[in-house]
Amino acid sequence: MTSVVYHAFSQKEAKELDVQHSGAQRAEAFVRAFLKRSMPRMSQQALEDHLQRKAVVLEYFTHRKQKEKRKKSKGLSAKQRRELRLFDIKPEQQRYSLFLPLHELWKQYIRDLCNGLKPDTQPQMIQAKLLKADLHGAIVSVTKSKCPSYVGVTGILLQETKHVFKIITKEDRLKVIPKLNCVFTVEIDGFISYIYGSKFQLRSSERSAKKFKAKGTIDL
């Protein structure tokens, strides 16, 4: 294939194309002159070394490996978590005594949050802190409700969603109490805080940035 592509012009072709044959000496002289012009700082000996080599690499480019984009693993959606029942508390785990240590941790968390609960601590300050605090582990009681069966229910808060509290009672019964139309109390070290569920329909993570009014309607 190479012999077909590269071959010398015949005399007839050279005449028609006006191409003159250059001898080996003229070709060598041309290469030497070209190298000298291209690399003027190189010595004659170095040029001779270049000419003695079989091949001269003019340029070389390394092929950059394309970095594979790592796909970020997406977490489960809320719908998928519900379908997998990840939030469900198993019946064998629905025991009040099992969550008493959680309640003790919650009390210490609130004491640290309020810089210590002292008798002279302002109740308004505690109320403001509790409204934005994480209530998981608190003992919550229903004091008022439009549904009489909810009144008097007391237990440790295990789960909080936007619209309900899930609490475990001393009788080891898991109760789901809607926030709407209910008033709750939270007690710690003698301080009692009231939570109006109708105004408390927020997720636990959203309450930390919520500005609650000091005074508002208390209708169920």
UniProtKB/Swiss-Prot annotation:
Its main location: nucleus. The keyword Phosphoprotein applies. GO terms for molecular function: ribonuclease P activity; ribonuclease P RNA binding. One of its GO terms (cellular component) is nucleolus. The modification Phosphoserine is found at S10. Keywords: Nucleus, Phosphoprotein, tRNA processing. InterPro entries: RNase_P/MRP_Rpp29-subunit, RNase_P/MRP_Rpp29_sf, Rof/RNase_P-like, Rpp29/RNP1. It holds the Pfam family RNase_P-MRP_p29. GO terms for biological process: rRNA processing; tRNA 5'-leader removal. It comes from the Eukaryota. Component of nuclear RNase P and RNase MRP ribonucleoproteins. RNase P consists of a catalytic RNA moiety and 10 different protein chains; POP1, POP4, POP5, POP7, RPP14, RPP21, RPP25, RPP30, RPP38 and RPP40. Within the RNase P complex, POP1, POP7 and RPP25 form the 'finger' subcomplex, POP5, RPP14, RPP40 and homodimeric RPP30 form the 'palm' subcomplex, and RPP21, POP4 and RPP38 form the 'wrist' subcomplex. All subunits of the RNase P complex interact with the catalytic RNA. Several subunits of RNase P are also part of the RNase MRP complex. Component of ribonuclease P, a ribonucleoprotein complex that generates mature tRNA molecules by cleaving their 5'-ends. PANTHER family: RIBONUCLEASE P PROTEIN SUBUNIT P29, RIBONUCLEASE P SUBUNIT P29. Belongs to the eukaryotic/archaeal RNase P protein component 1 family. This is Ribonuclease P protein subunit p29.
